[in-house]
Amino acid sequence: MNHKIYRIANGASGSSGSTEFDLTKKDITPMGGFVRYGVVKNDFVMIKGSCVGPVKRIVTLRKALRTHTSRAHTEKVSLKFIDTSSNFGHGRFQDAAEKNAFLGQLKIKSDA
């Protein structure tokens, strides 16, 4: 499995989902959390493609034994946008502030 590593970061930082092109402060966790996982609070590695293995178990990563010389492996990675919309249903908002700005006030709160 020769996967390209896109990002290594801390999930607890407030800007783990932002890039140098998209400067909005957002977490890497999508709205509602990852499906059957939840909220990312620790360090994480973002790789290209998928990774085989049991759900929620440790996956060991190691450096490749041979040096990669192809253009696809040697080109520099620059992420332009990380989608953090909900993975449940038809998510279209990147964070709660964007959702509140679009939908407006949904419920009238009484002062009782």
Name each model feature, range by range.
Residues M1-A112:
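Low-complexity, rRNA-contacting terminal tracts
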